Amino acid sequence: MLTIALPKGALLKDSIRLLQSAGLDFSAFLEPGNRQLQILDRQERAKALLVRNSDVPVYVEYGQAQLGVVGYDVLREKTARVAQLIDLRFGGCRMSIAVKASSPYRSVLDLPAHCRIASKFVHCARDYFHNLDLPVEIVPLSGSVELGPITGMSEAIVDLVATGQTLRENGLVEIETLFDSTARLIANPLAYRINADGISELIEELRQSVTQAIAATC
């Protein structure tokens, strides 16, 4: 049976809606009070796992799920060995560098050498500054990275930004965008190659759904 890893949080509702367009119903995950982490499609064609966004590529890479939906930011950070198949065009956000609005920094090149950068996305941050040949110290944080510049622990942060409201409310401003991120459909490479459990047919249905959604907005 085909297993699909779905992300908890902001991407879940759109992920379920997309799969419904291909005849797979995992809407039980959205029911109030639901605590199930694994459910069958109502027609028992497939199974879904509800996992942390950052864990989706891990389940797919190791074969516990043949397909998964995950943000591109996670794929850049995790560098998992998975096949990236479709840009699903939802969950749009950007990986940005932000500083205190009152600071003198208005460009990443204004940042002093060996300054501190706070981030949950350590690999993305380190890779970006390495490519700029700008030596910095990456300070790993698990949450509320905005406090880095506010408390003086760091000169800047690297974090996901959707509307920018959280930054503004905390007196921060974006000075650079590393990359844009949207939800992606990923697959276990072996399962994709051998068309395990009819995976290719479902992928094509999802691709058509995304294409139709794009056409409807044009």
From Swiss-Prot:
Keywords: Amino-acid biosynthesis, ATP-binding, Cytoplasm, Glycosyltransferase, Histidine biosynthesis, Nucleotide-binding, Transferase
E.C. designation(s): 2.4.2.17
Keyword Endoplasmic reticulum tagged: no
GO process terms (BP): L-histidine biosynthetic process
Protein's name in the database: ATP phosphoribosyltransferase
Protein's cellular compartments: Cytoplasm
Single Gene Ontology MF annotation: ATP phosphoribosyltransferase activity
Role noted for this protein: Catalyzes the condensation of ATP and 5-phosphoribose 1-diphosphate to form N'-(5'-phosphoribosyl)-ATP (PR-ATP). Has a crucial role in the pathway because the rate of histidine biosynthesis seems to be controlled primarily by regulation of HisG enzymatic activity.
Originating species: Synechococcus elongatus (strain ATCC 33912 / PCC 7942 / FACHB-805) (Anacystis nidulans R2)
Gene3D superfamilies cross-referenced by the UniProt entry: Periplasmic binding protein-like II
Domain of life of the organism encoding this protein: Bacteria
Cysteine-cysteine disulfides: none
Catalytic activity: 1-(5-phospho-beta-D-ribosyl)-ATP + diphosphate = 5-phospho-alpha-D-ribose 1-diphosphate + ATP
InterPro entries in UniProt: ATP_PRibTrfase_cat (IPR013820), ATP_PRibTrfase_CS (IPR018198), ATP_PRibTrfase_HisG (IPR001348), ATP_PRibTrfase_HisG_short (IPR024893)
Biological pathway: Amino-acid biosynthesis; L-histidine biosynthesis; L-histidine from 5-phospho-alpha-D-ribose 1-diphosphate: step 1/9
Subunit relationships: Heteromultimer composed of HisG and HisZ subunits.
Description of its domains: Lacks the C-terminal regulatory region which is replaced by HisZ.
Similarity comment text for this entry: Belongs to the ATP phosphoribosyltransferase family. Short subfamily.
GO CC term (a single one): cytoplasm
